[in-house]
């Protein structure tokens, strides 16, 4: 029987990106070992390829990804990719499992990515085509933010989601 859903550990990406502390690569490796030894998740979002100035917490994400793939070959490691520039970097460095993000709220999308929703949709389409063309059996997942309410614009009308 096929699973209806997969669980993802996002500690090393979502958990660290809001931290005031900037973790070293060795500290991130220790966190990875702790997660693997205690929980052994099959799917892990290991980091994000973003500007080091915008999110210094995600520094060394590519190095951590490569380390994780080598150390734990039975797990699936994902990288959150916000745009085509960082997608090309990820593909060129062997990333094959991708997390993408968009929003239902134009206001949230502009604040989060500096792009309007229509531009984000075009960018995502371009990114997915790029992955399909340049990777062998890539796995892609999409985060959809603000499906009920936006912290900036308030309640989201259900018709916009459909």
Located regions from the model:
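Catalytic cores of alpha/beta
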Residues: 82-95
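Alpha-helix-loop-beta-strand connector modules within alpha/beta enzyme cores
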Residues: 54-79, 119-141
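Short, well-ordered coil/turn segments that N-cap beta-strands
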Residues: 2-5, 40-42, 72-77, 94-96, ...
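Glycine-rich, proline-tolerant flexible connector loops at the mouths of alpha/beta enzymes
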Residues: 41-68, 102-116, 146-153
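Conserved, mostly hydrophobic/aromatic
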Residues: 15, 35, 90, 98, ...
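Non-cysteine beta-strand/loop elements that form the S-adenosyl-L-methionine
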Residues: 8-10, 96-106, 140-145
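Active-site mouth loops of central-metabolism enzymes
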Residues: 8-29, 75-84, 109-116, 146-160
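Conserved N-terminal beta1-alpha1 strand-loop-helix module at the mouth
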Residues: 1-46, 57-61, 67-71
């Amino acid at each position: 029987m096929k699973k209806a859903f997969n669980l993802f550990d996002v500690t090393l990406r979502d958990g660290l990106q809001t931290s005031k502390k900037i973790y070293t690569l060795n500290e991130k490796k220790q966190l990875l070992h702790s997660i693997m030894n205690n929980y052994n998740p099959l799917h892990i979002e290991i980091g994000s390829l973003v500007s080091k100035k915008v999110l210094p917490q995600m520094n060394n994400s590519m190095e951590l990804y490569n380390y994780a793939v080598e150390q734990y070959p039975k797990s699936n490691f994902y990288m959150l990719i916000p745009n085509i520039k960082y997608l090309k970097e990820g593909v060129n460095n062997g990333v094959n499992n991708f997390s993408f993000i968009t929003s239902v709220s134009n206001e949230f999308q502009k604040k989060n990515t500096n792009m309007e929703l229509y531009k984000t949709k075009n960018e995502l389409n371009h990114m997915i085509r790029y992955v399909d063309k340049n990777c062998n059996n890539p796995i892609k997942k999409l985060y959809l933010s603000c499906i009920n309410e936006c912290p900036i614009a308030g309640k989201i009308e259900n018709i916009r989601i459909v």
